């Protein structure tokens, strides 16, 4: 029952003997005037009211229009003063204030009403209440609550009274039959006081009449409807099976109670189905009775009404209304004299009866809930190690030994000076045929050569249109030629001159007439004709193909040799689908050998085919069974590859989605046979049907599925040709395409009315036959193939029997039946759950060999696709949904994506994160929105990473092959984008965009994160990546809007502000540089604001940061100039470096660290030793001091390296910055002097550190390489340009190396003891990541956990953001060599972070599962760790007496500090 409608009727029951004339729903939220209401208070209404569902039997008495009042249609907050209630209690509340409570027991249904009225009370009263269930003492909080009700501390409900004159009134509706009583207090907000019942709660008992007979029988269909209505009222919750059963029995009990109170089964049926004839007034007699119109006719008429209305998704109550309206329409027809038999013949012709039965089955009121199985999503993880694309390419670029003809072609091309327009090599018998076309001085030169041993004659002609045979002019015939009817014949001659090493037969033809476009030919060997796989050879004279090769580039990043093979065979493939599928099958072995890029090439080719970018049929007739057999062969090979090469499963699924299933001969043959039967049975043997029949016989294709659907839609629309063309055009078939078929379709359909039923039936069956061949991933077809079906033969038409796939899980078929029945539901949540459950059940079968594996794969692909379309259809359902529902949808779509892709570990951990966020929200955790925002950010990163993978893998192949094949450029430009859009990733991205602003608002995050709060004025410049402009010098003050900022970049000269949607850490290198350089830096989370800023490119903006926002406005040149002058006045003096000298030692211990020997990093860590609290650990350190690099370089063993570096340094000084990379590479060639090895070993062992050489010479070599990498980082681009920017002499920069033992960290952190974003020195700001700190300070995507902590309350850290970094770095016990330059000591220059710190061993990248991380899941653990980090920072700040920038790690709960420096 509709609550709003039901309560409007309830309002009418509270009035005196008046009723509103109009019957429409009343929705204004105002409360009616009191004149009507007061009359009700004084005396009980004489009006007899009998409530029956949504209708009310009343005696109408009209009132003047001006006295009508609009009452609120809110479901619960209703005015109540009916004194006719069964139970009434009065309470004195002091003074002249009284409370009256009336309880109205259920008269029908299961709703009790409790009315409250306070007389002479305050204006602001609230009912503070809860329900007490039978056998319980604690309050429960019913789901049915009046408007304005709020939950108070999860313990009570608080509902405002409605003021009416001097009274305050309120009604509660109680549907839960388990509730025995209502307990409450009244809160007087105006006087801030509680009104109690003698110091305790008020308690009002509900009245429940006893059932007269315990075994009252209720028809099951009525119990089902009542159960459904209860479930709907309670918010369509996802009940477990035991709760579902309990609810079903509760519905039965409600109906039994109703019968016990005197209601008949007929009354109940009428109430539930809204057909109570007693609900009509005497003024409106009801003519239609249920007995007049049989149910099946009413259902058929309702179906017709529903179809005409556009098949809307009616709620159950509307469906019943429609059924009764249909019954009423038919009754009117009967009254006009039409008989029931005539009605039946008119309505149930054609397929209407079958459709009605199917529709009614799908729309039944049965409670169809699903309890999904509990699963650990970790089982979804697919991790495969496939060869990197670069390595595969290197293998592919190692060409096999050239054949004789290819070697000849290479040498011949080098001899030809003229531009080569076309080059083709054809396979012929046991050899090859080369054709080269060149252009010279207006003449076309054709050179042919073959390595066949027997004498060969060329049988040839010329063409003015492709494929045409015209006899060549006699003037151009080579010696020995003869002229025939439409051709010439010329013998090949042995090639014995030209200095070519390969001896072949060759022939040259020179064509002077520029009107010819190509040359068709065949070869003649004795009496044998040699053709191009059954067709004529043809070579074009156009330069287009050569230009295409140039546009295609060199094929880098592709399986080039395979793509070239595909391009060479395309002329053959375009003859028919049989040819294309057989060629593809022949190439699967080559693709397997080429690996990931090979299958990418096949996917690109098949995708071009599926999107009609390639010709489907050209001058060739083929039987449908031959096409289906070729498909069958190809899909068998793809199925086998799916089993044997699991690392390529994602690409193989995508290939299969572009190819129909195919099948044994009978399946394809039925396409040919069945169309004949359709024509014969329905008398439609000419016109369009005959033309389509010819096309089907000679070259059926996926277009035929669309044509069949267009015919069905045309017939259903009562033969509207507009509908026919609409279906065709929406699916890419135009009139021109119909005419382009070898067997063209010229005519439009033209059927008679009496053909309608039979054609709908037969074409519906035919559609299944077409889809069985062409639409392997069609849902209905895929389900039928897995569950099995049988189609009987008829006359010459063969029968088809498909057996069910064995080993399907228990209950799996029920899931599929549900999916088919509900696939078009508008409310998609339950459908999505069933689809995902079906995919989860199917997954284990896909991971093991099965002779019907491809049927299971096509089913899985179809289920995957259906999830996407269902989600897109369900967007409307989410328009007003709460964030929890959007998060649930996100989790379903993410699960679907994880089921479809490889290397999905990050996606699976995102999925676990969403489930945790939902759990936090449902559990009342205040941090749920903050945590969900981090999961959302990580999910976006995962999607971006997946999109980048697709682009890297597929786009080069698409561009190379597409350029050669002449595919439209627009199709190439969006190739990867369209691949992504075809999957769940696009739907997921859309859902994330819906949720993001909601989470930001809930978590009070705003639209900005201010990283460097500096006011700035400048010209707006928009760039894709900060990295691409980091070395630029902007002459004018510039505000950069950069789409991508990773965190490691430099901010270019002249930039005064940097705005990005990216999320670098607040403590990343670029963030620190921005604050030090007084550059405004902020992340903008609002896409609308970002778009507005981008649209202002070229204009001058003033940016004014606040703690949580940036206010921007356009300004003029004068304001810009005044701002620039101010900046220039504040520019600091030039910085200077002092060159350090070698101090005589290759290695020193921590107690020898001085400013002449090492940088601030080493000195600070030595200073902390013994001074910090015992709870803070300091790692043992030694160092290679300043000057050691220069000393090593000057050693005799490194003379060659020194000379090479000298040359490169000169090159660099002349402005050739490419020398930087060469210098770094050359530094790595240094050899270690024996004395260095000796001293370093002694110092490390003397300090208690392990000596790498003890594990073998190889380990020392690893350590030595790490040391050299630190030295070489002096010449990394970022550092070099940074020193130039502040005019530091780069030659004076010296590099010491701090050597520390690595602590295998659980977490790493960076602390700024003054909040860098706000400048607040009373609070500490810190960021924490899993594993080593490189993910925090380096260019690793995502955000760290961030928090602040007041120094006066170090026990109360406040989390600002949860982590979204997908990767953590972990390492075994090892040694790290840290850069320690003299550039880090300069005040006003942030030299820290510019140079590399290199561990001896490589870190392991681990995808992080935050759902099992105690820092996230355990609040007490988090509070302890964060407090300890803050304490360590505070202690070090106090030790130095100034703000500090501190790095450290956490291991087994203990804090270690690895370095500190003054905070810039």
UniProtKB/Swiss-Prot annotation:
Its cofactor is Mg(2+). Optimum temperature is 35 degrees Celsius. Changing residue 1069 to A: Loss of activity, no autophosphorylation. GO terms for cellular component: chloroplast. The reaction takes place in three steps, mediated by a phosphocarrier histidine residue located on the surface of the central domain. The two first partial reactions are catalyzed at an active site located on the C-terminal domain, and the third partial reaction is catalyzed at an active site located on the N-terminal domain. For catalytic turnover, the central domain swivels from the concave surface of the C-terminal domain to that of the N-terminal domain. Keywords: ATP-binding, Carbohydrate metabolism, Chloroplast, Kinase, Magnesium, Metal-binding, Nucleotide-binding, Plastid, Transferase, Transit peptide. Its main location: plastid. This is Alpha-glucan water dikinase, chloroplastic. Homodimer. Optimum pH is 7. The keyword Metal-binding applies. It is found in: Plastid, Chloroplast. Belongs to the PEP-utilizing enzyme family. The N-terminal domain contains the alpha-glucan binding site, the central domain the pyrophosphate/phosphate carrier histidine, and the C-terminal domain the ATP binding site. The gene is R1.
